[in-house]
Curated annotation (Swiss-Prot):
ATP binds at G826, V827, P828, G829, C830, G831, K832, T833. Residues 50-452 are annotated as: Methyltransferase. This is Replicase large subunit. Residues 72-280 form the Alphavirus-like MT domain. Coiled coil: none annotated. The lineage of its organism: Viruses, Riboviria, Orthornavirae, Kitrinoviricota, Alsuviricetes. Heterodimer of a large and a small subunit. It comes from Odontoglossum ringspot virus (isolate Korean Cy).
Length: 1612
């Protein structure tokens, strides 16, 4: 999770800084989806609670060891051996996971309470009391169950449903849950279908291994899963074996094996060593003369070994595996019974068919690697005897000592000198003033004894040398005799004792007449044999899967039945299956019923299974349905006459404004709610309801339910506050408040005052709704106990509206209006309010607005002329109109910001106003109606307003030009503006919300927030008191209003869904101002990025949105040179300061880096380096002093560094960066099959069909001559002395570094020490063999590639690149893809090698040479002779290999071909790790980044751009072709280099730069070049002036010299 969170944070930061703008949204979404998918998968794992207190390291250890579980670490229980005790729960759950749920299971020595808690009523625990400790533990288990039940009883909770069956079984039949018998003697049995299983958690130690198989067979156990502690060291000749991960130790004494925990006082456990070893080493556990249990190890986790014992029937074995053999006992019996018969008859009778099987288990001992067993001698002064023991010591340490002391003279070869040397190399050493730890960690307590052994070994070795020498001179005696003679001369009188000790101790093997040093085996094999007699043959029964298949067949037939329906792909299959299973219904029957309904063959006919159609189907039938049918049958005229004649009726009144009479008496007062029980108000369920009638009626019903749900939710929350009030701080102002009537004080003080209503708790505990009156800030209460209020009960809003709507129903149904409804859809600031004021007739029309602020604003604007036209009667808020309905009719109804309202509310407003026409003004892209009641259903089709006519307004009178540019990305149609302000948007990211203070951080204009919490916090800080507009509002509250200046503030650092580029809240916030908008945020978020992007839009573009701008005519120029670049000479102008300014603008801060002494600082300071296994020669840590080279100093300041000196630390840092710590991102991959598939795709994508065949003759003399012509004479001279009889070691490479650091074109040099580039290369002799070979293979590959579509950039000039891209059609919509891969070389592994080898094979690589090449690139050794570093690498790409460049190019091409449909690609270019693809715009692509991670092990980032960037060059395509510009930023960076040695070197440098940047002389396409640079560098400005300056200085030799000066003189 840390990885996903860090990735998402990086994406947000990049968005704010303007990086990766083209793919940032896609990348963020992908990271989010991956995180959600992984977290959802993790959440489905079984959950285990780990309550013991353990360390953070142990938490990580347990989590990594058991990834199958979601472990929650509470750290709430201190206990002995917490780690091991807590792991027992995990181990038990892991064992039970292996068993099919519900299968009969025996837990051998188990804990019955653990199974009760999990609700496993199918487990029987055998819990024998083998000692007093067992009795105590079983009592403790019973106590835990009692404690658990008491805790439930105290909290008045019942048992969870899943535990009830297990606890009931224990209550009714406890012997079925557990018994006190040994597993071998357990009498419990159950006769149920299915297989039987067993688990043994740390309990098989006490079951004799010879009885285990029979005991399992007695219970007919199918598989037994077991777990036990063990250490491989117990198989060695050692008395103790520590288990470090759980802090325990095994101690062996004879056959007694003790187990105890370290560093604590606990009971010990004792077992039989021989019995434990049998379980470890045996494979077969015979159960009878037919059945045997076969043991297999499963895994080892945290010092616990898991295995399973599977029952095997030997009768299932193939008959041919048995052999004939004689049974000796049967032979003698037959001879006794039939002595008179011949011996042959007796032999035939005793012959039996025997099966023999053998299994071997290898045990690996990691601690004995590179160790030898050295004998130690200890003499006794008292007895005069000598004891011998053994110790394991590092092999390298032993032979280092022996080799060194062999160089001593005879006089110096003493015990003291040997001990002194051993002690010195064991201790820490000082190298160049630095303390370095010895690489050998040998126990100091054995150094003296080891020194004596080394002395004896050296004496013996010298004597052996003399014996061998004399043997060639004396042939009358054996080597052994001469050897003993020399020993006798050396030790004198001690010879007999020494001789006896040497022979008995193993130094001298008399039988073999040789000396031997013992080396322990890393692996020890234990074999187990099984012999069974053949008696019968049976067939292995197949698994019965008929029932699941029958069920699957039924669902398949049912879904086949349903497939005939239209839009069947939207059918919810999961819900269909759940319905059939819950109701136990045949799926086929259900499917036929559904099909019949959908085909109108049954009732409930509707076309589509949508809520709207279902509502129509459930609507009541018209009352005159029968009469309609009669008319259709009998009438001879048209069924629907155009003129309808009425017998009688009433004409409408000609005037408006008179009172009208409601069918009901009057609007019911909210007083009906007073003292109403809360239970009568609460909604029991908010599940999706089915509404009937037309869509308008359904919307109105849904709105009434919404009001009821809102009141219900508020009442429910107030009841909860009354229940939870105790323990709260009475002085803390909260959203809710509780007043104690008896005590006369606030138990919980609310923020608001004078609430309209609340919930009161009566003395009998009943809760009722009360309408409140206040006096002196306290509610006037009746005979109540407590009263609860909240911010939702400040006014009667929802109560009043609901009562009004209920009073207007007719027969319980809302009656919609038939007035004409017109929707005016306008952009922000289009003059909707102005249009209302210009159209409305205040005498007979009504204006309704959602909020009070808007209502005041309309009244103020309508009456600004001095004549009062607008009043509180004809301009009202929606809430006021619905709560205080007046019996009056209106001609026209104007609803401002009507789309912010519930559509049912709009329908009610139109109906209750009795208007003839309704004008609903709104914005489909701004904030819609927000459903603020959780879980209340507001279907999507209800959110669409039903209207008769729609008018569109796309001219904004309010918004400045830059905001208009943003709105054009939101609305259909072109949005224009009349505002003269061009730029108005700005953003500022502050360090934190503590910065905001009215005095130090004043905010201009109207202050707006996104959330209520931010609004409240700004109020607390005093901003409302100093604001010119007084009140601070949220974005939602001021929709529809206009201000000159706006300040939007975000104080919440956590992610907000309201703030996204597509959020309507962002659109509303950006469109409230006429002059200026400034956004203050504590985090980088999408709105900051929007502001940043708007600030970069050119004034020319913004002027086009103004309607009063003049008409701009574009000059059309026809083609002059079709297919060629238009050439406009670049003016040679500008100064050095122009280049410096451009560099500082694109890479701010890089020119201020003082890096001259970075290398010196790194060598002097302490460094912590993460180094893999390698050998370092510290004698090379201090380089030989050399005279420092003088270099020219550049005038232009860049991040370039001086060349560095090679040395141990510098080379090691480079090796770590380039070769160590390679990524490991690959998932599970079939290397061979996947590689073959990738190569086939590579071949199909890039190779011309006519040339797709192989070539078997790449090695020719012509190929060798072509290669040799490219080599230097010195290389050929080195090869002249090589005999080529055998190759040097092909798996050995040399390592060196480049002295000049690579310049980076980002801001990383400011805080990162750049590692040097490395060169890993073969010897010249190997290159002489494989250089011509791969050069020829490369030539053949490039000849076969479709060069019209794909460019493999090898030895191509800029002109050739331009020619390749010149046929791009600029009229075709396309985009550029770039796959940026970091750590490219060291990310390549075995899979990449397999892909590359298959490609070379297709081209005809020789089989023998291919195998040699493979071995040289599998496990390779690197040696850096300059720095004294040796290490080993696997499969990485070597930077100095003969196939480095073409291999990298092929791999990146194969990578993209495996993920992207290359047949859809327009153009593609590959070079090393660089790639660029032109694809059609909108092409649907797979998740390339994920594929690069999981298949190719690449840390990749995908960029979508308009212009390509390839090998440091910008590819600018246009209607005439394409032009390639060398990166100007890279050029300027090179002009700041610090490695120029002389004027001649400077001139060579200028010429090389002129060659690569020749295209900059053409300024015709500088505009496109600037756009391309802006895609890469977000701070880029128009750099044409800098480009001209570059051309000026490169084209003049003398002028170029002024860019550098040598330190000893002035410029020049």
């Amino acid at each position: 999770m840390a990885h996903f969170q860090q990735t998402m944070n990086n994406k947000v930061i990049e968005a704010g800084m303007g990086r990766n703008s083209l793919i940032n949204d896609l990348a963020q979404r992908r990271v989010y989806d991956n995180a959600v998918e992984e977290l959802n998968h993790r959440s489905r794992r079984p959950k285990v609670n780990f309550s013991k207190v353990i360390s953070q390291e142990q938490i990580i250890q347990a989590t990594n060891a058991y990834p199958e579980f979601e472990i929650t670490f509470y750290n709430t229980q201190l206990a002995v051996h917490s780690m091991a005790g807590g792991l027992r729960a995990l181990e038990l759950e892991y064992l039970m996971m292996q068993i099919p749920f519900g299968s009969i299971t025996y837990d051998i020595g188990g804990n019955f309470s653990a199974h009760l808690y999990k609700g496993r009523d199918y487990v029987h625990c055998c819990m024998p009391n083998l000692d007093i400790r067992d009795v105590a533990r079983h009592i403790n288990q019973q106590d835990t169950v009692s404690t658990y039940l008491a805790r439930l009883e105290r909290s008045k909770r019942g048992l969870p449903v899943f535990q009830q069956s297990a606890f009931n079984k224990y209550m009714n039949d406890p012997d079925a849950v557990c018994c006190d018998k040994r597993f071998q003697d357990c009498s419990y049995s159950v006769d149920l279908p299915g297989k039987t299983y067993a688990v043994a958690l740390h309990s098989i130690y006490d079951i004799p291994a010879d009885e285990f198989g029979a005991a399992l067979l007695r219970k007919d156990v199918h598989i037994c899963y077991a777990a036990f502690h063990f250490s491989e060291n117990l198989l060695l000749e050692t008395t103790s074996a520590p288990l470090d991960e759980i802090g325990a130790t095994f101690y062996k004494s004879g056959d007694r094996l003790s187990f105890f925990f370290q560093n604590e006082s606990t009971l010990n456990y004792e077992h039989s060593y021989k019995n434990v070893i049998k379980y470890v080493c045996k494979t077969f556990f015979p159960a009878s003369n037919r059945f045997v249990y076969h043991k297999e190890f499963m895994c080892t986790r945290v010092n616990t070994w898991f295995c399973k014992f599977t029952k095997v029937d030997t009768y299932f074995l193939f008959r041919g595996v048995y052999t004939r053999g004689e049974d000796s006992e049967q032979f003698y019996t037959a001879m006794d019974e039939a002595w008179e018969y011949k011996k042959t008859l007796a032999m035939l009778k005793c012959e039996r068919t025997i099966f023999r099987d053998r299994a071997a288990v290898n045990f690996w001992f990691p601690k004995v690697k590179d160790m030898v067993i050295v004998p130690l001698f200890d003499g006794s002064v008292t007895s005069g005897k000598m004891k011998r023991s053994e110790v394991m010591v590092n092999k390298d340490f032993v032979y280092t000592v022996l080799n060194h002391i062999r160089t001593y003279q005879d006089k110096a070869l003493t015990y003291k000198n040997v001990l002194s040397f051993v002690e010195s190399i064991r201790s820490r050493v000082i190298i160049n003033g630095v303390s370095a730890r010895s690489e050998w960690d040998v126990d100091k307590s054995v150094l003296q004894a080891l020194s004596m052994t080394f002395l004896l070994q050296t004496k013996l070795a010298e004597a052996k040398d003399q014996v061998v020498l004399k043997k060639f001179q004396k042939f009358d005696d054996t080597v052994t005799n001469l050897f003993w003679k020399q020993i006798s001369d050396a030790v004198g009188d001690l010879f007999p004792s020494i001789k006896e000790t040497l022979i008995s101790g193993g130094f001298v093997k008399v039988a073999e007449q040789s000396l031997q040093i013992k080396t322990p085996d890393e692996y020890i094999t234990f074999a187990d044999k099984l012999v069974m007699e053949y008696k019968a043959t049976e067939e292995l029964q197949h698994l019965d899967i008929s029932k699941p298949l029958e069920r699957a067949e039924k669902y398949y037939n049912a879904l086949s039945e349903l497939s005939v329906l239209k839009e069947c792909d939207e059918f919810d299959i999961t819900q269909f299956k759940n319905l059939c299973e819950e109701k136990d219904i045949d799926p086929d029957v259900v499917a036929k019923v559904i099909v019949a309904i959908m085909k109108n063959e049954l009732t409930l006919p509707f076309k589509n299974p949508t809520p709207e159609a279902l509502s129509d189907a459930l609507s009541p039938l018209p009352k005159d349905l029968d009469m309609r049918f009669d008319l259709l049958k009998l009438s001879t005229c048209a069924p629907f006459p155009s003129v309808k004649t009425l017998d009688s009726g009433l004409l409408p009144k000609q005037s408006y404004g008179d009172e009208r009479q409601f069918e009901s008496q009057s609007v019911v007062s909210v007083s009906d709610f007073h003292l109403k029980s809360v239970e009568s108000v609460k909604m029991k369920s908010m599940s999706s309801a089915v509404y009937t009638g037309p869509l308008k009626v359904q919307q109105m019903k849904n709105y009434m339910d919404y009001l009821s749900a809102s009141i219900s939710a508020t009442v429910s929350n107030l009841c909860k506050v009354l229940k939870d009030v105790y323990g709260a701080d009475p002085e803390s102002a909260e959203k809710s408040g509780v007043y104690d009537v008896v005590k006369g004080k606030w138990l919980l003080k609310p923020k608001g005052k004078c609430h309209a209503w609340g919930v009161a708790e009566l003395n009998n505990g009943e809760k009722v709704i009360v309408l409140l009156e206040w006096a002196d800030g306290f509610p006037i209460c009746g005979d109540w106990r407590r009263v609860a209020v909240s911010s939702d009960s400040l006014i009667y809003s929802d109560m009043g509206k609901l009562q009004t709507l209920l009073s207007c129903l007719k027969d319980g149904e809302p009656v919609p209006s038939d007035a004409k409804v017109t929707l005016v859809d306008g952009v922000p600031g289009c003059g909707k309010t102005k249009e209302i004021l210009e159209t409305v007739n205040f005498d007979e029309d009504l204006i309704l607005v959602p909020g009070k602020e808007a209502c005041k604003m309309i009244i103020k604007r309508a009456n600004k002329s001095g004549h009062v036209r607008a009043t509180k009667d004809n301009v009202r808020t929606v809430d006021s109109f619905l709560m205080h309905l007046k019996p009056k009719t209106y001609n026209k109804l104007f609803i401002d910001e009507g789309l912010m309202l519930h559509t049912g509310c709009v329908n009610f407003l139109i109906a209750l106003s009795h208007c003839r026409e309704a004008m609903v003004f709104g914005d489909t892209e701004q904030i819609p109606f927000i459903n603020r009641v959780a879980n209340f259903p507001y279907p999507k089709h209800f959110a669409t307003l039903v209207y008769d006519h729609r008018e569109v307004r796309r001219l904004s009178l309010r918004c400045p030009a830059d905001v208009t540019h943003f709105m054009n990305s939101k609305y259909d149609g072109k949005v224009l503006c009349t505002n003269d302000v061009i730029r108005s948007v700005d953003a500022e990211v502050v360090r934190g919300k503590g910065v905001f203070n009215p005095k130090s951080k004043p905010l201009k204009g109207k202050i707006i927030t996104f959330t209520q919490s931010d609004k409240a916090e700004l109020k607390e800080r005093g901003y409302e008191e100093v604001s010119t507009f007084g009140e601070i509002n949220t974005v939602h509250e001021i929709q529809g209003e206009t201000f000159e200046d706006v300040s939007v503030v975000r104080l919440t650092p956590t992610p907000l869904e309201l703030i996204s580029k597509s959020s309507p809240h962002v659109l509303v916030a950006l469109t409230r101002h006429t002059k200026s908008f400034k956004y203050y945020s504590v985090v980088l978020d999408p709105l900051v990025k929007v502001c940043s992007d708007l600030s970069k839009v050119s004034d020319f573009i913004l002027d086009m949105y103004k309607v009063d701008a003049g008409i701009l005519x574009q000059l059309q120029v026809g083609s002059i040179f079709k297919g060629e670049n238009l050439f406009v000479p670049c003016p040679k102008s500008g100064y050095i300061s122009d280049m410096q300014f451009y560099y500082d603008t694109l890479l701010p801060g890089n020119s201020t880096i003082l890096n001259e002494y970075d290398a010196v600082t790194m060598n002097l300071r302490e460094n912590n380096l993460n180094v893999k296994d390698c050998t370092i020669d510290f004698s090379k840590s201090v380089s030989v002093p050399r005279q420092q080279q003088e270099f020219f100093t550049p005038v232009i300041r860049t991040a370039a560094e001086r060349p560095r000196s090679r040395g141990l630390l510098e080379n090691l840092v480079a090796m770590i960066k380039r070769n160590f710590n390679s990524p490991d991102l690959t998932g599970i991959l079939d290397i061979e099959d996947t590689a073959e598939l990738v190569v086939n795709k590579f071949w199909d994508a890039y190779i011309i069909d006519e040339l797709s065949g192989g070539n078997v003759t790449p090695m020719t003399s012509d190929a060798f001559h072509r290669w040799m012509a490219k080599q230097e004479k010195s290389t050929i001279g080195q090869l002249a002395d090589f005999d080529f009889v055998d190759l040097p070691a092909i798996d050995q490479y040399k390592h060196m570094i480049k002295a000049q650091p690579k310049q980076k074109l980002d801001l990383s040099p400011q805080d990162e020490y750049a590692a040097l580039q490395t060169i890993v290369y073969h010897s010249k002799q190997i290159n002489a063999i494989f250089g011509p070979l791969f050069s020829e293979l490369t030539r053949q590959l490039l000849e076969r590639i479709d060069s019209s579509k794909f460019l493999f950039y090898t030895r191509k000039t800029p002109e050739q690149i331009e020619e390749f891209f010149s046929d791009l059609d600029s009229t075709v919509p396309m985009e550029v893809l770039e796959l940026d891969i970091s750590k490219y070389d060291k990310s390549q592994n075995e899979f990449h090698c397999a892909v590359e080898y298959l490609i070379w094979e297709k081209l005809g690589l020789n089989g023998f040479l291919e195998e040699v090449w493979k071995q040289g690139h599998r496990k390779t050794s690197l040696k850096d002779y300059t720095a004294g570093i040796k290490t080993c690498l696997w499969y990485q790409r070597k930077s100095g290999d003969v196939t480095t460049f073409i291999g990298n190019t092929v791999i990146i091409a194969a990578c993209l071909a495996s993920m992207i449909p290359m047949d859809k690609v327009i153009k593609a270019a590959f070079c090393g790790d660089d790639s660029m693809l032109y694809i059609p715009k909108g092409l649907d692509l797979p998740d390339i980044q994920s594929g690069a991670n999981l298949m190719w092990n690449f840390e990749a980032k995908l960029y979508r751009k308009r212009y390509g960037y390839f090998c440091g060059r910008y590819i600018i395509h246009h209607d005439r072709g394409a032009i390639v510009y060398y990166d100007p930023v890279k050029l300027i960076s090179k002009l700041g280099c610090k490695h120029i040695k002389s004027l001649d070197h400077l001139e060579e440098f200028r010429i090389s730069l002129c060659d690569v940047s020749a295209s900059l002389n053409n300024c015709a396409y500088y505009g496109q070049l600037n756009d391309a640079i802006a895609e890469v560098h977000k701070t880029a400005v128009n750099g044409s002036f800098a480009f001209c300056s570059i051309v000026k200085y490169l084209s003049d030799k003398n002028l170029f010299r002024t860019l550098f000066y040598n330190g000893s003189s002035t410029k020049g």
